[in-house]
Amino acid sequence: MIAYFKSLPDGYFPVDGCVLLVREAWQRFLHLENLPKHMDQFVTPDYAHELIDGYQGQLIEPIQKPEHLCMVAASGKGKWHCGVFSAEQMPGYVIHTLGCTVKIEPLNQFRRRFDTVEFYRHATHCRVSTSDTKG
């Protein structure tokens, strides 16, 4: 996943196209179809939280810790931003947009710029665990 997003040219996503990046990651790597398409630029934290609240239980569900391919939503200082989490490499990276450029940075570095960071997975996407299955 990291290699795919690194290969994209500058301008692939529009300015403030972070939600489109998450949408593309979920379509490409979780094979999801019919995801909503949002391109609102300069989304306020309040408006973003309204959208997230409206999608909870149907499209997304909050999780306490980041999982591979979860959406990372962050807000602070009147800004809202999002990206997708990759656990392909340690310590775990957030893939997001900065202007029209794809940016990949460690989660801890991403967190420092925001007051609140939350994690959401696709509501029908659950981690597969074989440790507690009985054959």
Task: Indicate residue ranges for each PLM-predicted region.
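Aromatic- and glycine-rich peptidoglycan recognition patches
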Residues: 78-135
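Residue-level preference for short coil/turn positions at secondary-structure junctions
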Residues: 65-66, 90
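N-terminal capping segments
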Residues: 1-61, 65, 73-75, 79-80, ...
